Amino acid sequence: MKYRIFKMKYTLLFLSVIALVHIFAVEAKDEPESDALVPQERGCLDIGKTCKDDCECCGCGNVCYCPFDWFGGKWQPFGCSCAYGLKYVCAHKQKKCPNV
């Protein structure tokens, strides 16, 4: 008898957790996606986001870093991403980029 009550309690607890997870999943789907900003709509990209130019990265000292930037050009087989730059980057970006 005790085993049956014990089993029933844990079954109800498990079903309650499943129902709670389902409710949060449904609420997440119902939120409008129009409020979400697309990276192109924002003025700049955060650290770690894929970029093509220094001007796309947020902040005065952040740069578009290409770890495998071979031959000095912007040919990057593995892509570039926004990263923290050095102090002189800020002066360079202010000359180059209108949005800094």
Swiss-Prot record:
UniProt keyword annotation of Oxidoreductase present: no
Tissues and organs where the protein is expressed, per its UniProt entry: Expressed by the venom gland.
Domain of life of the source: Eukaryota
Predominant location category: secreted
Disulfide bonds: 44-58, 51-64, 57-82, 66-80, 90-97
Signal peptide: 1-28
Cellular component, GO, one term: extracellular region
Propeptide: 29-41
Molecular-function annotations in GO: toxin activity
Alphabetical UniProt keywords: Disulfide bond, Knottin, Neurotoxin, Secreted, Signal, Toxin
Localization in the cell: Secreted
Keyword RNA-binding: no
Similarity annotation: Belongs to the neurotoxin 09 (Tx3-6) family.
Function comment: Probable neurotoxin.
UniProt note: domains: The presence of a 'disulfide through disulfide knot' structurally defines this protein as a knottin.
Protein name: U12-ctenitoxin-Pn1a
Species name: Phoneutria nigriventer (Brazilian armed spider)
